[in-house]
Amino acid sequence: MKQYLELCRRIVSEGEWVANERTGKHCLTVINADLEYDVANNQFPLITTRKSYWKAAIAEFLGYIRGYDNAADFRALGTKTWDANANENAAWLANPHRRGVDDMGRVYGVQGRAWRKPNGETIDQLRKIVNNLTKGIDDRGEILTFFNPGEFDLGCLRPCMHTHTFSLVGDTLHLTSYQRSCDVPLGLNFNQIQVFTFLALMAQITGKKAGKAYHKIVNAHIYEDQLELMRDVQLKREPFPLPKLEINPDIKTLEDLETWVTMDDFKVVGYQSHEPIKYPFSV
C-alpha cells in the first residue's frame, strides 16, 4: 500500500494538467512510476484505503488468458469491465469492423493467443512461454505482448497494460509488466492485482517458485473529476495490512485456466478495508 499511496501523493503534488482528447477531460499527470509486488511472500497488493473488488480484476485477466473478444464472455466470468468500451465507445460503435453488441475486436487476449502473421497463420504467444518455462527454458524473450499497432483499428481500445516479460533465475520466476497509461484511482487497483496474480498463476502451472513482479507505468494520471475524492477522502485514510491470495492448488496447467477455472478457485484472506469510493469512469 505504501508505494501506491506514494504514487497518488506524487501525482497530487507534482502532477501537471494534460488534456485527453479521447475522453475530453483533463488529467493530472506524472511520467514514470515503478512498483514492485512480493509474490514470493504472498503480499497481495489489494487497496485497503477503499474497498476493492478483486474478483473482477482476476476474472478480466482470466478472460485475456482465454483469448476472449466479447464482453458477454467476460460477464460470464464475473466482470463487466468491457461492457462500456464494447458498447458505449463512440469511435468503436462507428467502426465498420465492429461485429455487433458486446464485440471488443482484436484486443488484449486475442493478440496474446492468436497474433496474426502476414501469411494468415497465428502465433500463440502465451503457449510458447508456458512450454518454455515448464522445461526450465528462458530464452530472454519470454514476452507476451498485446500491443499490435497494425490492428488497432480492429479493436475497441488500445491496450493499457500491454506487455509482460517473464524471467527465470534458477527455479524462481519473475515478471516485469509494462503499462503505457494508467487511471490511478480506478485502473491501478485492477492492474496491481492482475500483475501479481499473473505471476502467481504462471509459477504454479509451470512448476516454478514465484519471485517478484515489477510493474512499470509510463503515464500515471488522475482525471479531473477524480481528484477531489483522491485528495480529500482516500489519501486521508490510514491503510490496513496487506492480505493474502489463495489459489486452488489443483490448477496445474494452461488447459485448466482455459477450461474449468472460475472465481471460486481464488480466495483473499485477511482483507480489511475502508468504505468504498465511487470514482467516475471515463470511456
Swiss-Prot record:
Its main location: cytoplasm. It is found in: Cytoplasm. GO terms for biological process: dTMP biosynthetic process; dTTP biosynthetic process; methylation. Its EC number is 2.1.1.45. The keyword Methyltransferase applies. InterPro entries: Thymidate_synth/dCMP_Mease, Thymidate_synth/dCMP_Mease_dom, Thymidate_synth/dCMP_Mease_sf, Thymidylate_synthase, Thymidylate_synthase_AS. Pfam families: Thymidylat_synt (PF00303). (6R)-5,10-methylene-5,6,7,8-tetrahydrofolate binds at residues 183, 282. One of its GO terms (molecular function) is thymidylate synthase activity. Belongs to the thymidylate synthase family. Bacterial-type ThyA subfamily. This is Thymidylate synthase. It comes from Haemophilus influenzae (strain ATCC 51907 / DSM 11121 / KW20 / Rd).
